[in-house]
Amino acid sequence: MHEYSIVSALIEQCEQHALANHAAKITRVDIKLGVMSGVEPSLLQTAFDTFKLDSICKAAQLNIQIQPLVILCQDCQSESVLSERTVVCPTCQSYRTRVLDGEDMLLMQLEMEQDED
């Protein structure tokens, strides 16, 4: 299950941002997850809930925004937002398309709290 290694890297990235901003804890982690990223949202949530317990993210809520697939057709030049996992142009049925968005997982925002000293 590669979601564990993905969450491990995500938490490491969160810890780096917290350290750079002198934060005591992270309370919210917002990510954008593309439908073609190969990551299963429910498994990612489970892995996050497990790994966060021993980190600065232990009180954090993970918010996952699913990013639909966005393609550009090389034949008719139409840009399409697709909810299904296909690279066929819905306008002209061409397979000559290029993926513009929906393949990545990105850390979008962190909510952090400072020390109260």
UniProtKB/Swiss-Prot annotation:
The keyword Calcium does not apply. Keywords: Metal-binding, Nickel, Zinc. Coiled coil: none annotated. GO terms for biological process: protein maturation; protein modification process. It comes from the Bacteria. Ni(2+) binds at residue 2. InterPro entries: Hydgase_Ni_incorp_HypA/HybF_CS (IPR020538), HypA/HybF (IPR000688). The keyword Zinc applies. GO terms for molecular function: nickel cation binding; zinc ion binding. Zn(2+) binds at residues 73, 76, 89, 92. Signal peptide: none annotated. Belongs to the HypA/HybF family. Involved in the maturation of [NiFe] hydrogenases. Required for nickel insertion into the metal center of the hydrogenase. PANTHER family: HYDROGENASE MATURATION FACTOR HYPA. NCBIfam families: hypA (TIGR00100). This is Hydrogenase maturation factor HypA. The gene is hypA.
